[in-house]
């Protein structure tokens, strides 16, 4: 598979990078669910991970050293609620791509429902909701309500 030169990415501003969208599609690697691993975090470690690696700006969660092309749009963010689900996948241009965020709340657990953030804007590296649905199913199957959880294919903490 081709590799997009890093200097192309480093020397592009957000607008130019968006214009590379059609080209970059040729460089993405095929994503498989077995490529990811589960990391269980305490609430304190989850908050530290978020504050260390992300910032929140006008309804975007973004890597601190990147712009929103590698981020995720979301409806609402409840940092101090019960459960958090964050999926990150390593892509071919050395960026971590956020693929989903799902919040769980106590009253939803009682009624067996989930507050699913359905207006997630996945960037063009992956097939959006199709991937999120697979991650969601795996997350529910493995769900431990006593822990916060993060999915990643790399050791990030």
Ranges and model annotations:
Residues 1-45:
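Conserved N-terminal entry element of GNAT/NAT acetyltransferase domains
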Residues 23-27, 49, 138, 142:
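Charge-rich, solvent-exposed alpha-helical interaction surfaces
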Residues 122, 128-142:
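Conserved acetyl-CoA-binding loop-helix of GNAT-fold acetyltransferases
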Residues 150-157:
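Conserved beta-strand-loop-alpha-helix junction that forms the acyl-donor binding cleft
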């Amino acid at each position: 598979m081709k590799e997009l030169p890093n200097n192309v990415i480093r020397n592009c501003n957000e607008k130019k990078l968006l214009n590379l969208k059609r080209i970059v599609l040729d460089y993405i690697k095929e994503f498989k669910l077995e490529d990811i691993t589960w990391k269980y975090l305490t609430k304190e470690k989850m908050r530290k991970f978020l504050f260390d690696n992300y910032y929140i700006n006008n309804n975007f969660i973004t890597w601190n050293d990147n712009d929103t092309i590698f981020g995720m749009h979301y409806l609402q963010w409840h940092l101090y609620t019960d459960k958090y689900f964050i999926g990150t996948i390593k892509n071919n241009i050395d960026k971590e791509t956020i693929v989903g965020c799902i919040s769980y709340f106590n009253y939803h657990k009682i009624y067996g429902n989930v507050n699913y953030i359905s207006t997630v804007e996945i960037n063009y590296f992956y097939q959006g909701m199709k991937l999120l649905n697979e991650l969601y199913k795996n997350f529910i199957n493995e769900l431990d309500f006593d822990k916060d959880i993060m999915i990643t294919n790399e050791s990030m903490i």
